[in-house]
């Protein structure tokens, strides 16, 4: 696969439509030859063009919508609306945990609210995943586009947002869990060993107590962390 390729973002290298068609075609062919997903992973910025170019590519070429995975789709309400439309075209979207409305991102949609919006709009839960962007850069710009500071995204927000979905937003635990387990495994075509607890799978497990607090972590069947 290829990624992340930034589009609709002032930090992007601004690939043309023809460049993205070529990249997606090569990723798809590489995936077919190697038995892998060949995904093109897209970093979505907040510019108003959003997913326009990707949806145009899907409409005018033979490249299936499932070849693209746009992440940060809850960055703005308009982008989320486009993501919902993209799902109706057969695509899949990735929500970013830890996104909150603030002075620098007033139109940002928290994951729990974004998931509810998607489900209420008829999006199949199987087409939604959630990731943390853990350790990714978190820059702060002034009104003129000058960078003021930069930090790193937390990995902890993924579980925090999952827990909030279940506890405060009445999202059933089996629905919320799919966004961080079987759904990303299927997108990456590693669901023959990841994303579920089944015979022959890798036995990567996070055990929770009755209050949904993490009490143990297993990786390939070995206890690597206990609280």
Regions found by a protein language model. Give the residues of each.
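Short aromatic-centered micro-motifs
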Residues: 217
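Active-site core of metal-dependent hydrolases
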Residues: 10-141, 147-148
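Metal-cofactor-binding active-site regions of metalloenzymes
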Residues: 1-13
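Short, small/polar residue-rich loop motifs at catalytic or cofactor-binding pockets
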Residues: 210-212
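His/Asp/Glu-enriched, well-ordered alpha-helical/loop segment
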Residues: 120-201, 205-207
């Amino acid at each position: 696969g290829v990624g992340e390729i930034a589009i609709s973002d002032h930090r992007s290298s601004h690939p043309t439509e023809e460049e993205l068609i070529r990249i997606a075609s090569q990723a798809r062919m590489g995936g077919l030859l190697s038995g892998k997903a060949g995904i093109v992973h897209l970093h979505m910025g907040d510019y108003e063009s959003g997913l326009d170019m990707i949806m145009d590519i899907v409409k005018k070429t033979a490249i299936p919508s499932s070849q693209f995975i746009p992440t940060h789709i809850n960055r703005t309400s308009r982008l989320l609306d486009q993501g919902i439309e993209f799902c109706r075209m057969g695509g899949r979207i990735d929500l970013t945990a830890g996104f909150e409305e603030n002075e620098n991102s007033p139109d940002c949609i928290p994951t729990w609210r974004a998931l509810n919006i998607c489900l209420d709009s008829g999006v199949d839960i199987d087409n939604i995943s959630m990731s943390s962007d853990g350790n990714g850069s978190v820059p702060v710009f002034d009104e003129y586009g000058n960078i003021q500071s930069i930090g790193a995204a937390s990995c902890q927000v993924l579980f925090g947002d999952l827990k909030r979905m279940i506890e405060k937003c009445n999202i059933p635990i089996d629905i919320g869990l799919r966004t961080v387990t079987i759904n990303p495994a299927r997108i990456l075509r590693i669901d023959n060993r990841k994303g579920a607890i089944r015979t022959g799978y890798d036995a990567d497990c996070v055990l929770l107590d009755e209050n949904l607090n993490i009490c143990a972590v297993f990786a390939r069947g070995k206890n690597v962390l206990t609280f």
